[in-house]
Amino acid sequence: MSEKIRVLLYYKYVPIEDAQAYAAKHLEFCKSIGLKGRIIIADEGINGTVSGDYETTQKYMDWVHSDERFSDLWFKMDEEEEQAFKKMFVRYKKEIVHLGLEDNQFDEDINPLEVTGQYLNPKEFKEALLDEDTIVLDTRNDYEYDLGHFRGAVRPDIRNFRELPQWVRDNKDKFMEKRVVVYCTGGVRCEKFSGWMVREGFKDVGQLHGGIATYGKDPEVQGELWDGAMYVFDERISVPINHVDPTVISKDHFDGRPCERYVNCANPFCNKQIFASEENEAKYVRGCSPECRAHERNRYVSENGLSRQEWAARLEAIGETLPQVETV
């Protein structure tokens, strides 16, 4: 039996001098021990998800904790059968979380070390979910929400996190005077966004400390009141959260049946994320629409070595046709 793989999720807002040089040093160490994952290092802190066997991940945690800036860094841990990443990336960026505030004329960025929402532990957050006078706001991307979310949470009409500040301003009158509690995967986005809400004038702003990942592991709440699965940005795509009464809420793009399997549309110019069973992925050549299924650069066709005749036959089976190739 192969050794279990540990997946570590973590972040910390802390000033890092010469962050670019530290990113290079960080990458060198990670590669030297065989760690895999994706890490962002910025002037404002560090944010990463990495995976490896017990010995490798322990070496990494010990090395990170040996730096006084990260001596109290909180690693959230999952055990898996396989690696969550294929390669190791450490990149320097201006911020570990980009709210788009400067781009969208929302004044300067937020420093969570100076202003952030009140921390709620899993038990307190569950109480907030059950409180009719509390607004629970999901701060993640739309495709993350569609795979799974807390029961009753508000789904902002946005495509990605950077659109959230404008959406909140547009809907301010709906919950400005109410208690607002926000949540995200591991907590890093909420640290910054809850601070922005405080600066915007919201009087009572809370955040799920440690994010959904921590809520699902809490021995008391055991992920209760979470519907679906949690989206993660690695090879796993999704992880279970609710250990009390788990449900599947996402539906197959093609037949509407319960499905938690995310794939990207095979048209490289679309690339939309859709839910699809393996059977329907093959049946519809992973195209989200007739146009994408017949697109000349359909990646499912090339990846699976389908001949043009085989491709045309699959489309014909679902009542669609493959355009003829023009010849000179």
UniProtKB/Swiss-Prot annotation:
InterPro entries in the cross-refs: Rhodanese-like_dom, Rhodanese-like_dom_sf, Rhodanese_C, TrhO, TRHO_N
Matches recorded under Pfam families: Rhodanese, Rhodanese_C, UPF0176_N
UniProt catalytic activity: uridine(34) in tRNA + AH2 + O2 = 5-hydroxyuridine(34) in tRNA + A + H2O
UniProt GO molecular function: oxidoreductase activity, acting on paired donors, with incorporation or reduction of molecular oxygen
Keywords, alphabetical: Oxidoreductase, tRNA processing
Residue spans crossing the bilayer: none
EC class of the enzyme, as a word: oxidoreductase
Catalytic residue list: C184
EC number(s) from the headed UniProt entry: 1.14.-.-
Every Rhodanese domain range: 130-224
Record-linked Gene3D superfamilies: 3.30.70.100, Rhodanese-like domain
GO biological process, alphabetically ordered: tRNA modification
Function noted in UniProt: Catalyzes oxygen-dependent 5-hydroxyuridine (ho5U) modification at position 34 in tRNAs.
UniProt family annotation: Belongs to the TrhO family.
PANTHER family the record matches: RHODANESE-LIKE DOMAIN-CONTAINING PROTEIN 7-RELATED, THIOSULFATE SULFURTRANSFERASE/RHODANESE-LIKE DOMAIN-CONTAINING PROTEIN 2
Protein name as catalogued: tRNA uridine(34) hydroxylase
Organism expressing this protein natively: Streptococcus uberis (strain ATCC BAA-854 / 0140J)
Gene name tied to this protein: trhO
